[in-house]
Structures are given as structure tokens and as C-alpha cells.
Amino acid sequence: VGQSGTGTLNIKQKGHVDGGYLRLGSSTGGVGTVNVEGEDSVLTTELFEIGSYGTGSLNITDKGYVTSSIVAILGYQAGSNGQVVVEKGGEWLIKNNDSSIEFQIGNQGTGEATIREGGLVTAENTIIGGNATGIGTLNVQDQDSVITVRRLYNGYFGNGTVNISNNGLINNKEYSLVGVQDGSHGVVNVTDKGHWNFLGTGEAFRYIYIGDAGDGELNVSSEGKVDSGIITAGMKETGTGNITVKDKNSVITNLGTNLGYDGHGEMNISNQGLVVSNGGSSLGYGETGVGNVSITTGGMWEVNKNVYTTIGVAGVGNLNISDGGKFVSQNITFLGDKASGIGTLNLMDATSSFDTVGINVGNFGSGIVNVSNGATLNSTGYGFIGGNASGKGIVNISTDSLWNLKTSSTNAQLLQVGVLGTGELNITTGGIVKARDTQIALNDKSKGDVRVDGQNSLLETFNMYVGTSGTGTLTLTNNGTLNVEGGEVYLGVFEPAVGTLNIGAAHGEAAADAGFITNATKVEFGLGEGVFVFNHTNNSDAGYQVDMLITGDDKDGKVIHDAGHTVFNAGNTYSGKTLVNDGLLTIASHTADGVTGMGSSEVTIANPGTLDILASTNSAGDYTLTNALKGDGLMRVQLSSSDKMFGFTHATGTEFAGVAQLKDSTFTLERDNTAALTHAMLQSDSENTTSVKVGEQSIGGLAMNGGTIIFDTDIPAATLAEGYISVDTLVVGAGDYTWKGRNYQVNGTGDVLIDVPKPWNDPMANNPLTTLNLLEHDDSHVGVQLVKAQTVIGSGGSLTLRDLQGDEVEADKTLHIAQNGTVVAEGDYGFRLTTAPGNGLYVNYGLKALNIHGGQKLTLAEHGGAMAQRPICRQKSVVKGIWQSIRCDRFRFPTVRTTIRGQPTFRWGHYVPMRMVHLATPGN
């Protein structure tokens, strides 16, 4: 019809044409038209070409009926054009018993088929845009307008478009490919309640490829609807598929959605559009596959039944949810499933959410989850980050967002960071994560890091396990909080685990503001290696308060203090090591069972570090350090009052070489206490009293800063205290001193207490090496040495000499002198503290006058050969009851004992400065 010219065939009023091969516009320039109109008007064909080389039109209307039993082609050759309209109950049947019969729209030319107003078409395999030059369009519109096909190829080598609108319906018996071959382009638009329906059940032959090897699009809007098997966008490496679902009641329901199988797939769900996948779904399936999904403005993707959703199976997958978009899965979601897989999930705002039973971020591949700006991620079964050995997962929860793993059920709700692989969880800027139990580094080869950073950032869990069997780290910084509802935190649970809890920053990093732990009753070092690090910037007097118990019998456990001021309030019982590298660690625990607040750990105070002890280890308020002590930093002791005892034990050892600054406390320098300070500086501050026991007490140094030192000796007579201190350095002057490279400041004041008996019992020079006879008491530089020192800083002039009762010993003092138990005289002495001649601290004393009691005998020297130092002397004798002074060059007593009534007895051979001798009672 219309071979070279224009021809028209009208079949109506029950007209009937039985044809074989029918061509409309069979030659170039030909225009052929066939109209089949009215009920029982029939056209039968075998081969039907509408626009073979020219232009052809077929109109089937008002229940007209057409059949084609071999093939039907619209726009057969290049340059041809074929148009078909089936409307108003008209029907076109393109089939026979052979399912391979084809309906071609735009084979090499241009073809368009429109089914409207209740038109019906039944076909087998339908090909739209069959060849490279072919352009085909299929329009199905209006209520009751239906085309039923077996297989639909839209854009085979050419360009194809399918428009389903206004309640139009396409029924697919098997599968559909949109953008079949490389270079092709196919588009399907389902809009205005149009419906693309795949018949039958199950997965077989009900699938859709959007972009098989070419370029495909599926657009569903304005209440359009698609029901199918599995939909794949970007099937082959060259395939590119785009799916758009928008508007309320626009729905795709399928048996699974795959974006980027081996090619590139995109899906955008917006404006309350909905995708329901009743089967496994993936983004980036093969290694070359890239799948991207965007859910926005109230759009939703539901994955139902017992199936997985995988973002980045072996390829790259990205799921972005914003502006109220939602994802809901009734099973598990994987990100980065296989080793080459890379999966990313972005939740971007407060109205966006992601709900899944469980989520595995970085199963064998790499997974990243970013939840921000108030968005919510729910995975109430579990959350795994770094699932398997090669897996690496990162989850970032920020800006008031929530990851919730908790339900009213007691099952699962586990958060595991580093299961068999490497996991990282960052909770920042007010982000919140809630789980039943949280485990970091679950297995021995795994690694997990959790960071809670920023005000209102929160990790809430029942119990916390850091380093279950692998290497795990939890950092609480910048006011981030760990809330432990079950009260227990475990570090390094099983061998060979290493579990580290950082307050502020990690060891070796710059200090940061501290985070907090709430509701925890204990931090326990397990069978592996537990490490508790304090590296923060809180340097206030109150400090960072640690109220929970630190416990655990872990020989490898460590408490590391790098910066800030930290206060331990519990009677900690951990073992291992306490390393005070820098900053101030205060022990403020009060126990009654000997617990020091640092357990049985070995304590090392590095040079910049300071350890403050404000604690007690018994009910009386005393404190005994039972820990091994090392390092060359500062240990300060300030107990609840100055009468509370501080001391060391044998376990303390002799390796501490720093400064022991004793404030409010009482300390005894003997045995273990002395040994502990063998290489250390003892600094005695205000309200400290240190007693020096009998014998040599050898320590590294002594510095006076307002404290009190009691020496176990009496004066005068002694030249060396019964209990004295030997030091390398003695600091008894105001100013700075340096010890082990660290500067300290003292005021050089303090009290030195010695025994000044009332009366003083003259030892009678019973040991000539350590005591002096009375005759020698007026010699130059006579004194008792209290401290022996290699180096002396200061003169001791600011020190105060006191007796054991605390009364100041005046520079001029009269002593009652007893010999052999009887007071026989009074001596006028001068006393002062001095460091001359530069080798220690002395109490210098000098006898200025003797008043001998009447009827008493006074022995000035017990051993022969004694001589007064001064050559000029005075002798007083009795002449008619009046004292006279006799000047003598050098007075020598008789060589035999002479006894004069009322006068003292002198032994032979002694020189004595007689200016010192006064009889107590004139006239005797």
C-alpha cells in the first residue's frame, strides 16, 4: 500500500482482508495507510511492514482487529517511518505458536506505536530501536490500554523509548533489556499511574536490565508503577543504567535491585518515591561495577524478607540518603563485601534514616559509613566494622547524629569494631552511638579504633571491651563521653590482646581536652595488655577525677600519664606499671587495707612528671608506699594532717632518683625509707616532720623548704650526730636548685630539732672521736655535724634551731651541767646553725663561762694532755672573801689531783683557760 505513491486501505463495517505479506510505503517516497475500524473489521497478515522504505501508518480503532503471524515491523529500512495507533478497543495480535515472532519498532528507520483509549496489543519478542540507525517509540496510555509481550528489547542497537502513562499497562511475560548492545540507548518512562508489570512469579525470566551493554534509563514518576523480578542497572562493563523513582505512590517492586553489576548503575529515589526489593540487592557487584543510589526528599528503599543488601560487593557502591530519605532492610547490609569491594553509605540530615537488622562495614573489602547532621542509623541486630581479615571499615557519626543498636530485646545489639579485620569508629561533634555491648578488636589479628570527640558526643554501651583478643583503642577527647550502663570497662581481655583507653590523646601525641567516663564502676586489665593513658589539658587544681576502680592482675598492664592533672580516687588494685611521664597524677584514695591507689604496679616518675600522694592506706590516715618506685621526677606527699605517717617498704627499692617533696606528713629516715631515697632528693616542706634515726642515713640529697628535721642526738659535746644524714647535695638556702635537670625552688627555711637536755649530762668524752670534753668547748668551730654533704647550697642562716619540745634554742643559752648524775655547774653557751666549712650542716656551740656549784667537783677533761686553746686565762681565788683575778700566761694544773674545799678538782696535766672558771658561792 503506497509502493511509490500514496495509497490507503480502509477496512471497516466488518470488512475483512486476509493478506500474506503487507508493506505500507514499500519504496522510498511511498506513503501507505491502513485503517481498520469497527467491531469485526479484520486484517490478517503474516509479515507486516509499516514503513518499509517509505512511510506507513496503521490505525486500529473502535474494536478493529489485526493479526500478524510472522513479524511486524515499524520503520524497516533506514530513512523509513512507520506509525501505529491502536485505540478505542482496537486490537493487534502479533504471534503464532512460535514464540520467536518479533514486533520491531524502528528496525533501521523510525517507528512509533501508540496504544491508547483501551487499545490492546499482544506480541512475542518486542524490539524497539533494533539497529544502529533505528529509532523506536512505544506509547501505552490511558485506562485499559494494554500491550502484552514476551520479551522486551528497548534500544537493541539503536534508540528506543517506552512511555507508559495515564493508567496504561505493559505486561512482560519474561525479561526486558533496556539499552541492549554497546552504543544503544533505551528509555522507559512510567508515569501518571502507568504500570509495567512482569507476569508470573519467581526470579527466572522476570528480570530487567537497564543498560545491559548500552545506555538504559527507567523513570517512574507521578504514581507510576513497576512490578518485576530482579532489576539490574549497568549489567555489562559497557552498560550504563539509570533508574529514577519520584513522587508519592510511584513504586518499583522487584525481587532485587542491582546497581552496577559489571557496568555503571544509578538509582535516584525522591519526593516520596518508593522502591521495594523483595530479594537480595547490591551496588557495585563485579570488580568493574559501580553502583550509586541517592534517596532524598522523602524517598524510600525497602529491602524485605531474609535477604542481604550489599554496597560494594566486588566493585564500588555508594548510597546517599538526604532530605528525609529512608532505607529499610529486614536483614543484613554489607559494605565492601569482597576484597576488592568498596562501599560507602552517607546519611546526611536529621530527617534521613537507615534501618537494617545488622550492618557489616568492610566485610572483606572497604566500607565507609558517614552519618551526619542529625541523621539516624539503626542496626538493632549488630554492627560490625572490619568484618573479616582483609576487611577495613570506617564509621563516622557526627553533628548530632545517631547510630542505634539497642532495642527492648536482650538479643544481639552488639557493636564490634575490628572483628577479624580493621575497624574505625569516630563519634564527633555531638554524634551518639548506643549499643548493648561494645567490643573493639575481637580477634587476635584484628585492629579497632574508636574515638569519641567533642561536647555531647556519646558512646553508650552496657559493657565496654577494648582489645578483646586483638589491638583495640578507645579515645575519649574534647568532652566526648563513654557511658557504661553495665559499669565495666575491660582493656586487653584475652592474650595476645592490647587494649588502650586514651583520655584526651594517645600516648606520644599532643595533649587534648579530656573526655569522660560515666557510670563505670571499674576499668579492668585483662589477660592481655591493658593500657590506660591520660594525656589531657586539664591542669586545674581539681584536676580530672577518676572515681572508678582500676583493677586487673595483668603484668603487662600500664597506666600512662603524659599530660594534665589527673586524680585517682579509688583504691586501685591493678598490677603492671604506672608511668608518670609528664603532668600531675594525684593519688587521693583512702583505704584501710594497705592499698596504695596504684595497686601493685611498678611506678616510674619521669623527669617532667609529678606524682602527688594525698591518700591513706590505713584507717589512721597514714600512707605506706608498697610499690616499686623508679624514675627521676617529682613525688609530692601531702597527707590529711602533719601527724600522719608516710613511709616506704622494701618493695619500693632503691632506683628512685627524683625528688621526694614531703608536705603535710611525718617521716622517719631509717631502713626502707632511707633505702628508697638512696639516689633521691628529700625536700622537707612546711608541715613535714622528718626524724633521723640512729646511724648514717645515706640519701641522694636534702633540701629545706619550711619543714622540720629531728636529729637523734644531744648537744653539746658531740661532734657527729648519733643519727646523721649523708647526701650528695644539701640545699639550705633560698632560691632555685637543679636536680636531674629539673629546676626546683625552695625558701631555705625550716626547723632543725636536737636534744638539749635539762640538765645536760656530760658524756665525759667517753668517745674521743665523736665527743668533746668541756675544755674543748671553747675551741674555734666546735660543733656537731648533722648532715654530711659533697655539695652545699646556702648557709643555713634561715634555719631555726629548736629543742625537741619545739622551743627555739637561743644563740646564748645557759645549760645545767650534770656529771655522773649530779648537776655540778651551769655553762653559758652560744649556739648557731652553719654550713661552714662547706661540707654539711652543723650546730656550732661555744662555752663562754662556767658557774660551778658550791661543794661540787667539775671535770673539765677526762684524758691526759688536754690543753685550752687560748693562751690568756684568768684565775679567781679567795682572799678574805673577795674574788680576785690573776692574769696568767698559761695556767697548768698540778700533776697530782688537788682537792680544795669548796673548789673543783682538776686532774693532772691539764691546761685550762681559767677565765672560764667561777666558783658558785663566794667565800667557799
Q: Where do the model's predicted regions map?
A:
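Surface-exposed loop/turn positions within long extracellular repeat scaffolds
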Residues: 18-20, 44-45, 67-69, 96-100, ...
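Fold-core signature of tandem repeat domains
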Residues: 1, 9-11, 17, 22-24, ...
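Extracellular, surface-exposed repeat/solenoid domains
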Residues: 475, 483-488, 493-522, 705-846, ...
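Extracellular beta-strand repeat scaffolds in secreted/surface proteins
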Residues: 9, 34, 58, 82-86, ...
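Tight coil/turn sites that cap or link beta-strands
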Residues: 14, 63, 89, 108, ...
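Short "repeat-start/strand-capping" segments in structured domains, especially the N-termini
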Residues: 5, 54, 98-100, 109, ...
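N-terminal segments that cap or nucleate solenoid repeat domains
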Residues: 1-12, 113, 218, 319, ...
